[in-house]
Amino acid sequence: FRSAREGANVVIAAKSNEPHPKLGGSIHSVADEVIAAGGQALAILLDVRDEVAVQKAMQQAAEHFGGIDILINNAGAIALTNVENTPLKKYDLIQSINHRAVFVCSQAALPYLKKSSNGHILSLSPPINLNPKWLTVFAPYTLSKYGMTLLSIGMAQEFKDYGICVNTLWPETYIATAAVTNNIANDEAVDICRKPDIMADAAFAIISHRETGQHYLDEGVLRGYGVTDFDHYACNPATKDQIQRDFFLD
């Protein structure tokens, strides 16, 4: 929505053709919100595990809007279980939706990004932290997210000569999303969260500049561009000092 307010053309590609009972919304409702915010929108029903469908989606997006400038790898699966308690089916799911999808989507978007004067790939994954605690409590999930970051490191170097910027972005704190309320706590968890707006503002700042090969935290990005007051990002102003630091950050 942050980009939409600047008049951007936005493609919403996901499996949610109908509102999800736990996640809420659909690709169509999000498209309506993008248009209401001032942008143009195209909703595409897509499973990022299907490489043929991804290639078709990229072609459809490029034909509809005349090209692709920015790819945001935002699809994600979460499983907060250790090796002993993670079924293989769940393991395969989180690997395929997280780091494999970054490979598939980035590769499919590459021919179009090479033609752009402002090509960007931004993946939502953390800086790599080898503190054993993150490799113990939920190693399969950690592997999938670190895989996204490692791939981004490689692509930043590989695509440099094409003028394509490749970076990652991760929240410094819990963000009030369904992933938090469904997997970490409950509806009361929003009291220790920030609003998604901070990630949107940070992402917009990243794609508005030409740095590459960086692994950003949302607050750090905004501080780098002069933001000093973060209180308005708190979901509950009364508990702004109790906001929880996110996974993978010591």
Locations of regions flagged by a protein language model:
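C-terminal helical subdomain
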Residues: T168-L169, N186-D250
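Catalytic loop of short-chain dehydrogenase/reductase
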Residues: K114, G119-D161, E172-I175
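A short, exposed helix-loop element centered on a Lys and neighboring polar residues
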Residues: S106-Q107, I153
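Substrate-binding pocket helix/loop in short-chain dehydrogenase/reductase
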Residues: N82-V83, P87-D92
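Canonical Rossmann dinucleotide-binding motif of NAD(H)/NADP(H)-dependent dehydrogenases/reductases
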Residues: F1-A13
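The beta1-alpha1 cofactor-binding region of Rossmann-like NAD(H)/NADP(H)-dependent oxidoreductases
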Residues: G25, L45-M58, L88
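Active-site loop of short-chain dehydrogenase/reductase
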Residues: G38-Q40, G67-I68, L113-P127, D161-C165, ...
